[in-house]
């Protein structure tokens, strides 16, 4: 039931006091011809409606949320308190810089810390999401070569295991995307060698990659990329696996985008809010978006980089998300962030060891923060697909993994438990997944018709994609 369907004429949740300001009639041209169709509800109606919706929802505050490549870690509530401090909450982006020195200091120190973590020389905090960061990075790549007069570089190389946003971001900027083949789950260096030429502008990589494997040839890849005059771009989706262990800048990457809403523990899902800062090495600093924050003595100021690509977001990005990430980094400290990565890798390997007893692991061995299992054998023997397994998992009150990604693994389940889950939770999740796989052999229809216990049963996803309904019509 929607809030509109709860509406009863004449009900009110709030009454305004009588105004002591003289009435003023707006000109007719500014008036609506009909009253707005707003719900008329009491305060209990509103509270109960949204409480009911919250009970039907699932979040990391309720349990494990092991979406691969999403890093759905628990978000400490201290971060929320910091973002809600009056000095941050009540400011306006048009205020004079002298009156928002605390906010500018936070942004300056945050980018300094992120540069230290990633091995970059400078960073913009403007992009509002990971894909937005990718787009910003690709705009920097394009502007860099345009500035050099090297306009023949029209290609971007992307592994076949890459996030779908990688080729999409490169294409949006006007680059031709060329796929690099994988070998044993990692970049095929020989295939890359064949593709590298004077037309290549950049190579986009995630390390660890989407299979949860560390690209062991990364230094060689960086050397080959730079020898042909191209730039090496780092998709920071999986940074949670390597903090304090190795830095993208030290691997040879020229550009990096981060996901503060993943690695640095700010709530995400359902479209945001996110933050996708972009860091660059020294030779690309002048191309960063504006405004940038700098420190001039004791004063923090805004400035425009010399060859800037322009604005990519209004004002300063998603500022409350920046506050939460800043709080998280200060709370954890260097040793704490390193421990985060250690525990993320440990949890993934522990869960993989449990799951490999009943599901295939195409690229087995030591993984990093996540791993990919395959239900291809289950599908072949029972007709039950990965989608059916994921839907049935919902009936047990936990969230399923990412499914059908990366595309190079048939019937894929991509699992990232993160560092914030304990052993008991991991054991329980493995137990649920094993039970569902066993049920696929004993009662496949139970999976094909799942979920059975959720407020919304299985939806027609094809119809929803082709004919989406985005708003309620009374």
From Swiss-Prot:
Membrane-spanning ranges: none
A biological-process GO annotation: glycine decarboxylation via glycine cleavage system
InterPro entries: GcvPB (IPR023012), GDC-P_C (IPR049316), GDC-P_N (IPR049315), GDC_P (IPR020581), PyrdxlP-dep_Trfase (IPR015424), PyrdxlP-dep_Trfase_major (IPR015421), PyrdxlP-dep_Trfase_small (IPR015422)
Any Pfam family hit: GDC-P
Top EC class, one word: oxidoreductase
UniProt xrefs under Gene3D superfamilies: 6.20.440.10, Aspartate Aminotransferase, domain 1, Type I PLP-dependent aspartate aminotransferase-like (Major domain)
CC per GO annotation: cytosol; glycine cleavage complex
Reactions accelerated catalytically: N(6)-[(R)-lipoyl]-L-lysyl-[glycine-cleavage complex H protein] + glycine + H(+) = N(6)-[(R)-S(8)-aminomethyldihydrolipoyl]-L-lysyl-[glycine-cleavage complex H protein] + CO2
Domain of life: Bacteria
Keyword annotations from UniProtKB, A to Z: Oxidoreductase, Pyridoxal phosphate
Modified positions (N6-(pyridoxal phosphate)lysine) in chain numbering: 262
Enzyme Commission identifier(s): 1.4.4.2
GO terms, molecular function: glycine binding; glycine dehydrogenase (decarboxylating) activity; pyridoxal phosphate binding
Cofactor field: pyridoxal 5'-phosphate
Quaternary assembly: The glycine cleavage system is composed of four proteins: P, T, L and H. In this organism, the P 'protein' is a heterodimer of two subunits.
Matching HAMAP family: GcvPB (MF_00713)
Family statement: Belongs to the GcvP family. C-terminal subunit subfamily.
Function: The glycine cleavage system catalyzes the degradation of glycine. The P protein binds the alpha-amino group of glycine through its pyridoxal phosphate cofactor; CO(2) is released and the remaining methylamine moiety is then transferred to the lipoamide cofactor of the H protein.
The protein's name: Probable glycine dehydrogenase (decarboxylating) subunit 2
């Amino acid at each position: 039931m929607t809030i509109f369907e709860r509406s009863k004429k004449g009900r009110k949740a709030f009454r305004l006091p009588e105004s002591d300001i003289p009435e003023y009639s707006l000109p007719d041209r500014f008036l609506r011809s009909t009253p707005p169709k707003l719900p008329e509800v009491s305060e209990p109606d509103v509270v109960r409606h949204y409480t009911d919706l919250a009970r039907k929802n699932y979040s990391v505050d309720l349990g494990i949320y092991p979406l691969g490549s999403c890093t759905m870690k628990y978000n400490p509530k201290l971060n929320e308190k910091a973002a809600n401090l009056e000095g941050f909450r009540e400011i306006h982006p048009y205020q004079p810089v002298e009156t928002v020195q605390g906010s500018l200091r936070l942004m300056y120190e945050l980018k300094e810390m992120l540069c230290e973590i990633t091995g970059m020389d400078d960073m913009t905090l403007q992009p509002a999401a990971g894909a937005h960061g990718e787009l910003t990075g690709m705009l920097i790549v394009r502007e860099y070569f345009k500035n050099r007069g090297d306009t023949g570089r029209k290609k971007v190389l992307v592994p076949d295991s890459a996030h779908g946003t990688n080729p999409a971001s490169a294409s949006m900027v006007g680059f031709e995307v060329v796929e690099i083949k994988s070998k044993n789950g990692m970049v095929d260096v020989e295939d890359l060698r064949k593709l590298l030429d004077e037309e290549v502008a950049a190579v986009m990589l995630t390390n660890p990659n989407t299979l949860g494997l560390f690209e062991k040839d990364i230094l060689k890849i960086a050397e080959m990329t730079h020898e042909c005059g191209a730039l090496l771009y780092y998709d920071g989706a999986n940074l949670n696996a390597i903090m304090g262990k190795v830095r993208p800048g030290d691997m040879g990457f020229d550009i990096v985008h981060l996901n503060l809403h993943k690695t640095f523990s700010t709530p995400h899902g359902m479209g945001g809010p996110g933050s996708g800062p972009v860091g660059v090495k020294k030779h690309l600093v002048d191309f960063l978006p504006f405004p940038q924050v700098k420190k001039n003595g004791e004063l923090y100021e805004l400035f425009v980089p010399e060859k800037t690509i322009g604005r990519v977001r209004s004002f300063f990005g998603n500022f409350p998300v920046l506050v939460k990430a800043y709080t998280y980094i200060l709370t954890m400290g260097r040793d704490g962030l390193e421990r985060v990565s250690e525990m993320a890798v440990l949890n993934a390997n522990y869960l993989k060891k449990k799951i490999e007893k009943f599901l295939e692991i195409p690229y087995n061995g030591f993984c990093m923060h996540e791993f990919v299992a395959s239900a291809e054998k289950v599908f072949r023997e029972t007709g039950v697909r990965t989608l059916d397994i994921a839907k049935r998992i919902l009936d047990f009150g936990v969230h399923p993994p990412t499914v059908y990604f990366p595309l190079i693994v048939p019937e894929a389940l991509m699992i990232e438990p993160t560092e914030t889950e304990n052993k008991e939770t991991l054991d329980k999740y493995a137990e649920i997944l094993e039970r569902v796989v066993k049920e696929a052999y004993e009662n496949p229809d139970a999976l094909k018709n799942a979920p059975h216990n959720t407020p919304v049963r299985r939806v027609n996803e094809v119809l929803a994609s082709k004919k989406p309904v985005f708003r309620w019509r009374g």
